[in-house]
Amino acid sequence: MDLLLLLFSAIWYILPAYVANAVPCILGGGRPVDLGKNFFDGNRIIGNGVTYRGTFFGILFGIITGILQHFIVILYMDPQSVFNYGLTGYIILGFLLGTGALFGDMLGSFIKRRLKLNQGQSAPLLDQMTFIVFALIFAYPLYQQPVNLMVILLVISPIIHFSSNIIAYKLHLKKVWW
């Protein structure tokens, strides 16, 4: 598989996770999933940045992304050139990648609170990698991918995450550029 096709395949596969991770920034807010409670160390369990509404819409848009991918494959692409899981498969993949991404983001927030980092403070690699690693873990039992595809995702994800955060900051969707 040539590098360009591998890169496209990697982004195509993980797209529901990227969308699920971005949507809470736009549609989140409301009640935090930790209900404002503190952990044993006296700091918030997760913080105000991870909410029920953001989690719900993140997972929902991960599923919607999977559905859209299915129809794009059918209408515009050679089904042999990309992953062709069928509608049900794309719905399940969107759910697993979206849920995994948001669980990874929650875990990242939990770790940041243990490190006494406030919401919005930068934690290089932790901010960029937990969502992608857990998206891959959640989807892996049903959707195993070649090692080279997963390595590409781990390499490009910090770059994509950084770039998308700068765009969100410029659009006033985020308070900080990281």
Swiss-Prot record:
Any one GO biological process: glycerophospholipid biosynthetic process
Documented EC number(s): 2.7.7.67
Cell inner membrane in keyword set: no
Compartments in which it is found: Cell membrane
Membrane-topology descriptor: Multi-pass membrane protein
GO molecular function: CDP-2,3-bis-(O-geranylgeranyl)-sn-glycerol synthase activity
Residue spans crossing the bilayer: 3-23, 56-76, 91-111, 123-143, 149-169
Annotated S-S bridges: none
GO CC terms, sorted: plasma membrane
Needed co-factor(s): Mg(2+)
Pathway: Membrane lipid metabolism; glycerophospholipid metabolism
Keywords: Cell membrane, Lipid biosynthesis, Lipid metabolism, Magnesium, Membrane, Phospholipid biosynthesis, Phospholipid metabolism, Transferase, Transmembrane, Transmembrane helix
Main localization (coarse): membrane
Pfam families: CarS-like
Catalytic activity line of the entry: 2,3-bis-O-(geranylgeranyl)-sn-glycerol 1-phosphate + CTP + H(+) = CDP-2,3-bis-O-(geranylgeranyl)-sn-glycerol + diphosphate
InterPro entries given in the database record: CarS, CarS_archaea
Function description: Catalyzes the formation of CDP-2,3-bis-(O-geranylgeranyl)-sn-glycerol (CDP-archaeol) from 2,3-bis-(O-geranylgeranyl)-sn-glycerol 1-phosphate (DGGGP) and CTP. This reaction is the third ether-bond-formation step in the biosynthesis of archaeal membrane lipids.
HAMAP family named among the record's database cross-references: CDP_archaeol_synth (MF_01117)
PANTHER family (alphabetical): CDP-ARCHAEOL SYNTHASE
UniProt family annotation: Belongs to the CDP-archaeol synthase family.
Record protein name field: CDP-archaeol synthase
